[in-house]
Amino acid sequence: MKKIFFAQCSILLLMLGSCSKMTEDMTPESVNKEASVKSATALAGSNGVCIAYYITDGRNPTFKLKDIPDKVDMVILFGLKYWSLQDTTKLPGGTGMMGSFKSYKDLDTQIRSLQSRGIKVLQNIDDDVSWQSSKPGGFASAAAYGDAIKSIVIDKWKLDGISLDIEHSGAKPNPIPTFPGYAATGYNGWYSGSMAATPAFLNVISELTKYFGTTAPNNKQLQIASGIDVYAWNKIMENFRNNFNYIQLQSYGANVSRTQLMMNYATGTNKIPASKMVFGAYAEGGTNQANDVEVAKWTPTQGAKGGMMIYTYNSNVSYANAVRDAVKN
């Protein structure tokens, strides 16, 4: 989920411990669709929704999950994996990606505190090479995987949905298609660390739409965080754009000129309503606040955007608050 300049990855590996996808180069259906657009605008403020990623590794220990401020609409738990929520005996509280919580009871209490204030809490779900197989996540089938995610996220933890982090490695398309180009997309080329949306991969998302998203019967959020430069992007949008409540672009560091190019492609080629499109602010990096605030205030030529997501809110709270204020004020 952490998208940065490709050239800076080696530096960030030392600083952050890993370098997941960021932009490689930061330079120069009617019924379902109608329901989907209404869902996407329901929470929006003057410049859309504010979505906060909260990384659970224990950083900034004085800023708890429950301290997420008002005017944040949704929080995505990031770092902590669904299998730790499934079996709470394997990762003790206060360790690893449970570093932000003394115990699972502490986690539960803080989740309820946010929900009592009207803030939705979602679980991040990473795509995985196993999604390209008949046994995603080691489950017997895509249907079994979808059932398990529903059981963990909805039944056990009473969360408000999931967000798919689509950027991880697996088999690439063969042949790799020609990239549309910077002027068309706001990106210079494919992100080579991503994987193809094979039929099996798409079937995993299809199973998740039974329980999450605009066509599910329970009002649970289905979001995606990815990039137009990800190999799977176009096929996912072709098949599921109407199912997502919000579509987050990991557009970290981009200025308004560049995000407008992204919006042009998303609304034109991908036929995504502008009101679903959420753009990314990289609080963790801490170096692009002026651009992020400008993008947060920006109204695209297509009309109001969906809003902004902030990665990771608890890494740099003053930076994150500035972006939130730009979205909501």
From Swiss-Prot:
PTM note: Carbohydrate at Thr-88 consists of (2-OMe)Man1-4GlcNAcU1-4GlcU1-4Glc1-4(2-OMe)GlcU1-4[(2-OMe)Rham1-2]Man.
GO terms under biological process: carbohydrate metabolic process
Pfam families documented for this protein: TIM-barrel_EndoS
Main localization of the protein described in the UniProt heading: secreted
Active-site positions on this chain: E167
Gene Ontology MF term list: mannosyl-glycoprotein endo-beta-N-acetylglucosaminidase activity
EC numbers, comma separated: 3.2.1.96
Record GO cellular component, one term: extracellular region
Record's keyword annotation contains Cytoplasm: no
Name of the featured protein: Endo-beta-N-acetylglucosaminidase F3
Gene: endOF3
